[in-house]
A protein has these predicted regions:
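Short coil-to-helix segment of the ABC ATPase nucleotide-binding domain corresponding to the Q-loop/switch region
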Residues: 95-102
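Conserved ABC ATPase "signature" region
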Residues: 65-66, 102, 106, 113-130
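Conserved signature/switch motifs of ABC ATPase nucleotide-binding domains
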Residues: 134-137, 155
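ABC ATPase NBD coupling module
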Residues: 67-83, 112, 226-230
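ABC ATPase "signature
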Residues: 220-221, 229
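Helix-to-loop junction immediately C-terminal to a conserved catalytic motif
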Residues: 50
Length: 327
């Protein structure tokens, strides 16, 4: 495991209980989206991973080492393998792009000749070689975040922490930054933790996700699993799943989940042909995830109890997830 959080509690001096019994693992090469509403504990959680904050109790293991047991110099060295980017970029306004990236290497005591080549390599990676002499005030928000990404990768980390890294950007720039991060993750084989309140970020970038609410992880799994079968009420809210059958009685109203391999199949048509029922489609949509697409239909079955049951068994036999909706 690249990251292991074990039995984490975080209580501030004012008595606020920010994190409660948090256990979390991140495997090598995974991109984990941590999503929740404001005040849920997301930023506290990510700052614990590199010990910018320390827990009240529990263990923080990164690359197999408990960071809480390290001396200050040992912790500083361990942090070099953990890159981090923030919502507001945190660039030094008096330094140009080249100098901002080089600064991380100077702190780590790289040789000057190696700093030159490394910075050029990083700026090429993020597409900013032609901006190396620009100052932050001359850059757009997306360009500033690209500088921050280059700086975070300076010391060749294997773990990248992103704290609301796209929240200050417009949707087009957000997409370009997520595309960049996805490419960098694959090229460098990084493990990534991405804190966000935007479900679109999780859909576009992540293969794993967890949902945090009031300091607790309420749901954890692959993005595909959670989108297909969300269990917690907060997860359903974040995914935009509401009372999709409106004012209709919930009797015989179901939500059917279609995974990628079933999206192009005429399943509803086959259902009507096979069984003595009609199917009324109430709503439907398709979510495009980074791993595979997932389709949803909310339908009402019009027919006898026996035929409806046979239709449900048929859908289950196909491997589809079917949930009866409640009022």
């Amino acid at each position: 495991m690249v990251v292991e959080l074990k039995n984490i509690e975080k209580i501030y001096e004012n008595g606020f209980h920010a994190l409660k019994g948090v256990n979390l693992e991140l495997k090598k090469g995974d991109i984990l989206g941590v999503i929740g509403y404001s005040g849920a504990g997301k930023s506290t959680l990510i700052r614990l991973i590199n010990c910018l904050e320390r827990p009240s109790s529990g263990e923080v293991l990164v690359n197999g080492v408990n960071l809480l047991n390290l001396k200050p110099k040992e912790l500083q060295k361990a942090r070099q393998k953990i890159g981090m980017i923030f919502q507001h970029f945190n660039l030094l306004s008096a330094k140009n792009v080249f100098e901002n990236v080089a600064f991380a290497l100077e702190i780590a005591r790289w040789e000057k000749t190696k700093i030159q080549s490394r910075v050029h390599e990083l700026l090429e990676l993020v597409g900013l070689e032609d901006k190396m002499h620009f100052y932050p005030k001359q850059l757009s928000g997306g360009q500033k975040q690209r500088v921050a990404i280059a700086r975070s990768l300076a010391n060749c980390p294997n773990l990248l922490l992103c704290d609301e890294a796209t929240s200050a950007l417009d949707s087009k720039t957000t997409h370009s930054i997520l595309t960049l991060l996805s490419g960098i993750q694959k090229k460098l084989d990084l493990s990534v933790v991405f804190i966000t309140h935007e479900i679109e970020v999780v859909k576009e970038l992540c293969n794993q996700m967890c949902v945090i609410s009031s300091g607790e992880i309420v749901e954890r799994g692959s993005v595909e699993e959670i989108f297909a079968n969300p269990k917690h009420a907060v997860t359903k809210e974040l995914l935009g799943i509401k009372n999709e059958h409106g004012d209709q009685k919930s009797q015989d109203v179901y939500r059917i989940v279609f995974l990628g391999e079933h999206l192009d199949e005429p399943i509803i048509s086959n259902l009507i042909k096979r069984f003595k029922i009609d199917v009324s489609i109430i709503s439907g949509n398709i979510e495009e995830l980074t791993t595979k697409d997932i389709g949803y239909l909310v339908v009402r079955f019009l027919g006898s109890v026996a035929e409806t049951q046979r239709a449900l068994e048929y859908l289950n036999a196909l491997g589809l997830q079917v949930e009866k909706l409640k009022d």
